[in-house]
Amino acid sequence: MMVLGHDENGHMMLASLPTSKDHVPSDMDIKSGCIDLPDRQVNVFVFQAGENVTTLQNGLSSFSFDVNTFIYGSDLDTYPTATFQSQIKDKITEIVLIGKISDTIFNSLKECLKNSKMVKNKFKRIL
């Protein structure tokens, strides 16, 4: 799960589950970064396989996805922060920090989603 932001009260978090499912039109080259085609109803941010996406910190090594990985603007959703924290406390959900996404990539991802017609306005306000 990739957390993209929180509402102004911190009660809801905006997140997306990165996927290896490729729904990019077959006539397009898949390149790293933003693909936004409003006339074809496509908004996706692509992480190419093997591309380092994290910054090194606190003993964590660099991280890259093994396969091309996608975050689709249409797949964003909000989740109650309190529920998520409760699940962690009660050991229902386990969090494994694999790294901190680089600021450059994270900002590009947020701009890609924020500028898309495919992303709901309520989500854009959080971004």
Q: Where do the language-model regions lie?
A:
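Conserved functional hotspots at enzyme active or ligand-binding sites that engage polyanionic ligands
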Residues: V3-L127
